[in-house]
């Protein structure tokens, strides 16, 4: 199922001397991968924070669903991406992870004035976009207000919309069906929700991969 397309197209870009890889026509059977990721419907992510007495908005103003699974067929994909970014996987090399997100049409979701939860990860991130959409990809940021990362809530579901004045978009990664982007996740980054494409009905669906330096 996770066979790489032998005719995939690899492009290389840079951001502050860091390589950014864009691979079009990534999977040989992307429809099969998408069906695997979304059926059955994955559970809402981080619902356990309610048991800890903390407030989360997942399931109320938006749905953030994640599949966490393992599939040995994915090992060769991790190997390929690991060679490109020169970093080993952050976890097991058969780890299947997805992001499925949609929003409720409510004034809470202020995509016109806010960015969705810019954050950092251990190392390189890989994202395969699985929607026919050319707008709502991934932004890479510079943080204009250094106090922002210190003062905002620790959990992404408490106050995920962050004022645009606190961040500068350094690079926009454009989505395309069956496109893989591989970039340095130590730069602040997040979903670029730029319109209401994923409000009420359709989910924004992608598969994600995480890597980290081995030092």
List each model region and its residues.
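Non-heme Fe(II)/2-oxoglutarate
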Residues: 2-116
């Amino acid at each position: 199922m996770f066979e790489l397309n032998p005719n995939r197209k690899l492009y290389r870009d840079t951001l502050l001397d860091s390589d950014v890889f864009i691979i079009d026509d990534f999977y040989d059977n992307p429809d099969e991968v998408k069906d695997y990721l979304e059926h059955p419907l994955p559970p809402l992510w981080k619902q356990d924070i309610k048991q800890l007495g903390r407030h989360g908005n997942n399931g109320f103003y938006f749905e953030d669903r994640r599949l966490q699974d393992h599939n040995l067929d994915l090992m060769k994909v991790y190997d390929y991406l690991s060679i490109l970014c020169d970093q080993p996987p952050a976890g097991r090399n058969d780890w299947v992870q997805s992001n499925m997100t949609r929003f409720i049409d409510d004034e809470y979701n202020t995509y016109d004035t806010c960015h969705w939860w810019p954050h950092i990860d251990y190392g390189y991130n890989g994202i395969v976009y699985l929607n026919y959409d050319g707008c709502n990809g991934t932004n890479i940021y510079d943080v204009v207000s250094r106090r922002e990362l210190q003062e905002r809530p620790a959990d992404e579901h408490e106050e995920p919309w962050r004022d645009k004045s606190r961040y500068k978009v350094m690079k926009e990664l454009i989505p395309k069906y069956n496109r893989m982007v591989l970039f340095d996740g130590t730069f602040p980054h997040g979903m670029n929700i730029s319109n209401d494409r994923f409000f009420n009905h359709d989910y924004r669906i992608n598969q994600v991969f995480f890597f980290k330096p081995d030092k």
